[in-house]
Structure formats: C-alpha cells, structure tokens
Curated annotation (Swiss-Prot):
It comes from Karenia mikimotoi (Red tide dinoflagellate). PANTHER family: PHOTOSYSTEM II D2 PROTEIN, PHOTOSYSTEM II PROTEIN D1. The lineage of its organism: Eukaryota, Sar, Alveolata, Dinophyceae, Gymnodiniales. The record marks 164 as: Tyrosine radical intermediate. It is a multi-pass membrane protein. Pheophytin a binds at residue 129. One of its GO terms (biological process) is photosynthetic electron transport in photosystem II. Its EC number is 1.10.3.9. It holds the Pfam family Photo_RC. This is Photosystem II protein D1.
C-alpha cells in the first residue's frame, strides 16, 4: 500500500516538473526565459524597485563615515539631475552589509545599505542576462558571439561597481547611481588616477567614438544602396522579407562608393569581415577600458609627467601634462573637503616644495 501511494505521488509531480522545464527552456514563447532567466528576473526586479524607492525617498547617507550625511533622494531636496542612490558609508569598507547585519532599518539606510542591495542584485542580474544570451543562442544553434559582445558592458559595470571599490578598500568609492553622481565619479577618478593619461582608457575612447563613426558609416551606406524590389508607387519595405536568403543591399556598390570617397582599401568587400570588424572594434576597446579601470583600482595609475621643462632662467615652461596635474590637484582638493583638509599630493612637504616655483 505504501509503495502504491509513493508511485502515485511520483506520477503526479514528475509531469508538472517536466512541464515547467519545457516551458522554461522552450524557444517558442514570445520571450525566452531560460534557466538563467529564473535568476535574472527576480534580481533585476529587486534592483529596479530598490533603486526607484531609494531614488525617491532614501534618507541621507554618511558616505564619508564622518557623521556628515549626504542626501540623494528626491524627497530630500534633490532633482532628477542631482539625485542619486548614495554609495555605502566609508565606515563599512568592503564589508557585505545586508539588512540583517544592521541593528535597525534606520541604521542600514544611514550607512547606505540601499546601494549595496541595488548594485549586487544588478550585477547578478546582468550576469544572468549574459548567460541567458548564451543559452538562447545554444538552443537556436547559433554561434555565441552575441554573448561575447555583451560581455564588454558587463566587464565595464563589474570594473566600476565591484572591482574598483574593492581595490580602493570601500564601497563608498563606487559610482553613485545618478546623473551628477556619475560625473562626480568621473572627476574624482581623473583626480586620483589620471585616467586621461592611461593607455587602456585611450583605447576605450577610440572604441566608443570609432564605433559610433563606423556604425553611422555602415548604416548610411547600406540604406543608400538598398536593392529596389518594388514599383515606384510602393514602399521599398514591401520588397523584403525577414529571413530572406538574398541580399537586401548591394555591397559592391557600397564598397565602390566608399573606395572612391576615401581610397580603395579603406572599405570591405566581404560582408562577414565587415560585420566582424564592426562588432570587434567597440567590444575589444571596452574590454581594454574595463582592464584599465581594474588596474587603476589598485592604484596602477595613468602616466604622470611630474618634471616640467625649465628655461634658461629656471622658470618652468608648462606643458599639457603640467596643466592636467594642476587640474587634478584642484579637483582632489574639492573632493571630500570635509573629510580631510588636503589630498595626499598636497600633504607631502616635498611635493609642496616642488610646486613652489610653479606658484611663484
């Protein structure tokens, strides 16, 4: 009797589990969920709701750990531009700070626990989205290049939100989740690490602006060389079908136009090589930028040319590097002005003596 009941129970549960597995992994649904999606949906939903609530109503956060809280929510005198989810307090360092680690909810909010909640759930969510792209490509029999391409922004987000705060020893050094907070993070990053003079950042700039240029060039060339398959009074869109085997544009005509516009070997005559280049250029550049931020997280900073060129009378002839250094010092003085009086560069007596001729 006991074995009969167990067999009936197993027969009732197995079909339901198999139905759930087939529903999760099927590619026939309007939106593919996948096993990674089972992790992506709750984490991204949690991060989104926590961010919205924190941006609207979070109390001020003691970001510097000196009992001088900074407000970031709309209910505390901020607007869309100045509002942000403030990073966790410097008093927390890189400690994991969930709600149950605080004595009360007020203490958790005061120490910026909202920031860790949003960032960690967001990080898990985007990594799950990355895995979901691979999973869908695998089930459709596609190559995994979409997954590889999306790894670039995931690497950049990981460098800014995870690697850099850990390298600096505190999540208070992470990027605030807001518009003005992002710009503040960029200025402070330049002041402390001289990122503009870092070769890996230069690759990233070339990737972003170059990728935008190549995308605009490719899109305009394709649109200008579409093969017309309809009559004059019909829309050109009626001549194409999704998934058709024939080309929709004349790559030879586009190649000839661009070759005559610049020079012959400046354009691609192979569609696969062209699109691989369009995908690889920005992806590799963003990878290198993420590597640069990760190295600067451990203070392997950009190139710094400290020695000025002196004329015959001993007066310095300032170069662009000197102007950049002076700007960095100014930005660093304004950063955390209540936490310390001077940045480390100005707290050194030798540095002050070396800067004295420039001041004079």
């Amino acid at each position: 009797m006991k074995s009969t009941l167990l067999n009936k129970k197993s027969q009732q549960t197995t079909p339901a589990w198999e139905f759930f597995c087939s529903w999760v992994t099927t590619t026939e649904n309007r939106l593919y969920l996948g096993w990674f999606g089972c992790l992506m949906v709750p984490t991204l939903v949690s991060a989104t709701f926590a961010y919205i609530i924190g941006f609207l109503a979070a109390p001020p956060v003691d970001i510097d750990g000196i009992r001088e809280p900074v407000s970031g929510s709309l209910l505390y005198a901020n607007n869309i531009i100045s509002g942000a989810v403030i990073p966790s307090s410097n008093a927390m360092g890189v400690h994991f700070y969930p709600i149950w680690e605080a004595a009360s909810l007020d203490e958790w909010l005061y120490n910026g626990g909202t920031y860790q909640l949003v960032v960690f759930h967001f990080f898990i969510g985007v990594c799950s989205y990355l895995g979901r792209e691979w999973e869908l490509s695998y089930r459709l029999g596609m190559r995994p290049w979409i997954f590889v391409a999306f790894s670039a922004p995931v690497a950049a987000a990981s460098a800014v939100f995870i690697v850099y705060p850990i390298g600096q020893g505190s999540f208070s050094d992470g990027m605030p989740l807001g518009i003005s907070g992002t710009f503040n993070f960029m200025l402070v990053f330049q002041a402390e690490h001289n990122i503009l003079m870092h070769p890996l950042h230069m690759f990233g700039v070339a990737a972003v602006f170059g990728g935008s240029l190549f995308s605009a060039m490719h899109g305009s060339l394709v649109t200008s060389s579409l093969l017309k398959e309809t009559a004059e009074f019909e829309s050109a869109n009626y001549g194409y079908r999704f998934g058709q085997s024939t080309e929709t544009y004349n790559i030879v005509a586009a190649h000839g136009y661009f070759g005559r516009l610049i020079f012959q070997y400046a354009s691609f005559n192979n569609s696969r090589s062209l699109h691989f280049f369009l995908g690889a250029w920005p992806v590799v550049g963003i990878w290198l930028t993420a590597m640069g931020v990760s190295t600067m997280a451990f203070n392997l900073n950009g190139l710094n040319f400290q020695q000025s060129i002196l004329d015959a009378s001993g007066c310095p002839i300032n170069t662009w590097a000197d102007i950049l250094n002076r700007a960095n010092l100014g930005m660093e003085v304004m950063h955390e002005r209540n936490a310390h009086n001077f940045p480390l560069d100005l707290a050194c007596a030798n540095c002050l003596l070396s800067l004295w001729p420039m001041v004079g």
